[in-house]
Every structure is written in structure tokens, then in C-alpha cells.
Amino acid sequence: MRHLALFLSAAWLYCLLGINTVLAQGAGYRKITIESLDEDVAESEQTLAEFSILAAAPLGTLLSRTGWTVTCSTSHSGNPCSRLTDGNAGTFWHSQYEGTVAQPPHTVTINLGATRVITGLAMRPRSDSSPNGWIARHEVHTSTDGTNWGSPVAYGTWFGDNTEKFANFEPRSARYVRLRAITEAGGNNQFASIAELNLYTATAKTQNTATGTWGATLDFPVVPAAAFIDPPTGKVIVWSAWRYDDFSGGNRGYTLTSTWDPATNVISQRTIQNTRHDMFCPGISMDGNGQMVVTGGNDAARTSLYDPATESWISAPDMKIARGYQSSVTLSDGRIFTIGGSWSGGEFNKPGEIYDPVAKQWTLLPDAEVVPMLTQDHQGLFRSDNHVWIFGWRNGSVFQAGPSTAMHWIYTDGTGDTISAGSRNSAPDAMCGNAVMFDAVAGKILSCGGSTSYQDRDATTNAHLITIGNPGDQATVQTITGGLGYSRIFHNSAVLPDGSVFLAGGQGYGQPFSDAQARLTPELYRPSTNAFVTQTPNSIPRTYHSIALLLPDATVLVGGGGLCGGCTTNHFNAQIFTPAYLYGSNGQLATRPSITGGSTTVAIGGTLAFTTSGTITSASLIRYGSVTHSINTDQRRVPLTLGGSGTSRSAVIPNDAGIMTPGYWMLFVMNGNGVPSVARTILVTA
């Protein structure tokens, strides 16, 4: 047998395998073993390559372990606590597994000897042939005195393998750090084991409640590249692709997902196989019945439904045209429209089609053409029909706001039609920018950021206020003076209960799978001033494949980025941003009004009755969102006019299905200081 050992960059490996993608700068090097495939070679030796997968490390640099005192809640005599920091990845600490077996949670506590600024923890699992003790569910706590630990600074579930795991978090001053190992990967035993444990340090940062704060980090077992909220339970479902850390080589017929339950803070993992659908780079929309419809992607023709009643995934008929990176949107009658998507399924002009959740069938609309809305991307059609900004509107119409400079109305009756709705003034194409309907009653849409091409071009600061009326009318476009404070591409936006729009992440130059020029300072668009103001920066880059969603408690989940296999920009985590409206002038969390009872369903044009505690002065409905690749066509906000008095209030729902798209919405009430309640879930029916 001929045998050759080489050191190749991850990018070279991808070229060798013929994978068409771009990896991050600074991708790590792997030892690649290439072996002969002669017939006389044993099958066990016919391996193309093996390499470890990296994740994004915490902010800063490794902290010296000099002066540390490490204690473990339990140890096996042959695997003492001292092996955690012996500098030898071939040895490991292990919880007691003989005699009286120690039960989880198992804890490892580090006394640094002095107060330091800590930004994260690195845990290297044992790397021998046994998976015993690989840690899954975990928490990381910090303390200044070793007695008061408070809530975790990071928590979640790590994927079960022997690659190095990180728990990244905002800088914290601490003398003590504790890792709690709650469950073992696979759930087979009660053990915990660690080969090496390290901490990261950086310069201290101050969180300012006047511009919002960043909370604990949620660790997922997958890179959360797509997400939605299950309205009846409040659980957040995220997924990556057929692998937890990579999308390439897809079309495997299954997807790795993870679920965060905010009620328990438990993060679980699940592989979806029954739908035979790799759901990376899909269209995502909630239909009028509240089911999530996920289309295309790596398995480009497939359709999968998430049923909130049973928390299960169901197969639906294939689309008429295979698609990937297409957009989809819910129509005024609850059906789903999709268009474009030449990233997968072939490069050709892909007109619209409609999914009917009642008839359970797709109908092609050959005259709902995509050609008029193509961008002038330097990569051609492969990119120019991606991630279209579309909004369901009156009488089954769809408004296309971008990313092309040209805007359009799409009609979905008969064989469909696409007509001009004007242009975003003189602004260039804005691929991978954002568009958010922050006031559906007034037809107000904010568009911001993006670039003239999908990648390898500078991002812009361009921002516009778009106003739409009746289908077929030319849209009114106002250029927002000054634009964004930071140029952005691959960012995400979430509309808030008060009508402002929160923008997070992105980068100044479009380079997928790189964190270069990452925008760590978020911004807030305020309609009252028609301007953007910066918010409190965070420490974890959120660039390509990142997500953001408004949560029912009026905070924003921001996470993900990467999904590039052998790279150092895989972000297996998310953070919670708490906007300033949840704080009082004293810097403490404000007392919130609450919705104490009332309707949970309402028909379009009907009256929504509810009771509250505290005095409220305003209310709004925000449709539950879904997000991938900076596109969230589900979210929109409807301000409400309040009726009633005292604690018994009501609001008449607009009698317009173009405004009140059927499906699940979040009802928020706000007091005179603008402090919002936790939302009440409302099902709006046609």
C-alpha cells in the first residue's frame, strides 16, 4: 500500500472534494491522510481524510493557568482533578465510576487566585476511543467571592464528540469560574470527563442599560443558521444542515435541529429524518393555520411542515421547481408563495409558485416572473435571485421591496403576474440587506444595508423608508438621511413592540464564513426620528448564517454564524439582547405591565378583548417570526387602537387580511413609560 501524509488547509480540502464554497480567513490546518484505494487494501484503511472541526473561540487570549486552584466535586482515583490542567490532552479527569458512582451534576471550580476579566471557557473532551463522560448539558457560572454564583453566564448543550468545546460570554470580572456538567452526551451514563480546561481573558467592557444589555449565552449542539418560535409553547427551534457544523455535501435527506425551551432553559437536540429533507438554506413561512412551511435548500424540491400542535415534522408535496436560497411569504388567505432560488436545484429563471395548505398541493405561476427582480450580482443567476424581500399584501398580492433596486408587485391569481412598483430611488442593489414591515397599518417598511453583490463587495449604509398602498400603486420611497451608523451585510433585524427596529451583526465587507469587519455594535431605528442610534456592543461576531428573532418576553435572540466545516468561525451559540425599554431610569429592570386574561383567538376584523394589570397606554400585535440568511418575511407589526378602560381593554383588529396575515401573533401592551408586557399568543384567523 502506498501511503502519504500531508498538511493541507481546510480550503484546499474543499477544493479537493469539489465543494463550491468560501471558507473563513484563518481557517485552521488539519493533518490529512491520503491512502491508496487498491483492491488489496483493507476497507478500514480506505479513508480519504480525517480532521477535527473547530469552533469560534471566545474573545481575547488564553489566560495563564499559573496560580490556579482547581477542585472537582468528584474524581476517580486513576483520573484525578489535577489532569484538567496538566497540559497533556492525552490524560483526563473523570468523575467517580467505581464503587458508589457519583451522580450529576458534576462540578469543576477554578480559583484564579485574583480577579480577572473572563470571556469564555474552553473544554477539551477526552480523545481516546471511549466517549464516556463527554459533557452535553452544562452551565458556566462566575463569582467574585466563591459563594455567590448567580445565574449562569452560559448554558446549553454541546454536541457529543471529542472536538474542543467553548462557552463564550460577555466579559465578566471574576475570581472563580465553575463548570457544571449536567448530562453526558448520548445520555448513556452519569459520568463526566475532561482532558483540558482553559479560560479566555480580554479587556473589560461596560454594559449600559440606557442602550440595552447582553445576557447569558445559549450553547447549541448545532450552528443555528435557521430558526423559528413554536407559538403555543414558546420553544425556539433552530437547525443547521445534515451536519451540526457544515452544510456542504448536503442532499442527505435529514437535518440536525435543536430546541431551546425558555421555560426550563433546557436545550435539546433532534435529528429530523422522516421528511427526507436537508433543510439548509430554505424558504420559511408560517401558513394561515400556524404550521411552519419549510421549502427547498440542500434537498431542493422538498417541503416540510412543522406542526405546533404535536411538535412534529411532516412531509408535504415537493415544489414544482427545485429551489435553494429562495424567499417565501404568507399570503392574505394563508397560502404560501415562493420565488427564485438558483443556489440549488439548477440555475435558471424560477417563477413563483403557491402552496395551498388545505389542498396540500403546489401550483406553478409561470407569469409571476423572477427576471424583473434579478440583481446585477457579479456571480450571475446563481446569486441574483436569492433572498428576495417579499411581503404578503391585500387580495393575495405580494410586494417585492428588494434586494434589487427595482421593486415590484406580484399577483398570484391565475397564472400570476409581475409589474413594476418603482425603485428605491438611486440606491444600488442591496443583496443580503434587511427589510422589515414595522407598521403594517400604514404600509411602512424599513430597508437597510446590503451590498451590490452577494459577496466580495463592500456593504453599504443605505437605508430607506418605503410606503405601500393598494396593489399596483407605485411605492413611495424616502432615503433616510445619514443611513446606518455602520455599513452592514448579512445582518438581521427584528421589529420591537414599540415600532422601533433592532439591527444586529453583519460585516462591512461581504465575505461568507469570515468574521473580518464584524459589526459588533447594534443599532436601533426609531420611526419617531427616522434615524438610527447605536446600542450596547456585544463580543461575539454575528456574520454570515446568523439569526435574530423577537421573543415573547420582548427581548431579542441573536445567534449563529459560520456553518463552514473546518473553519474557526462556527458559532454554536446565541445571546439574548434586553432592549433599553425594559429598564428604568435607575438602571434596574422596570416593573412590567401584564396581560392577565382574555381572548387567544380572533378573526380578521374582529374585536380582541383582554385584561391587564397596571395602567397601559398602547398595544401592538407582532407576527411570530422565522429567519434564515437575514430573511424574516413572517414578522410584521400592527399598532392597535385601544378601547375599554382600566384593566378591561379591547382592540378592533384591522379588517384587512393583507395587513393581518392569518397565523400566530404576539400581543404586547405598554405602559406610559413604554415598558412592554410579556406577549400573549393570539391566533388570527381568516
Locations of the language-model features?
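A structural detector for beta-sheet-dominated domains
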Residues: E35-L37, L54, T71-S73, N111-G113, ...
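A short, hydrophobic/aromatic-rich structural module that often spans a beta strand
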Residues: P58-C72, E139, A167-R172, I182, ...
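Predominantly extracellular/luminal regions of secreted and cell-surface proteins
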Residues: S52-A89, W389, V436, N462, ...
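Fungal secretory targeting signals
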Residues: M1-A24
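Kelch-like beta-propeller repeat domains
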Residues: T203-A686
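Chitinase-like catalytic core of GlcNAc-active glycosidases
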Residues: G156-W158
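Aromatic, loop-rich ligand-recognition surfaces of beta-strand-rich domains
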Residues: L23-T61, T74-P152, D161-K205
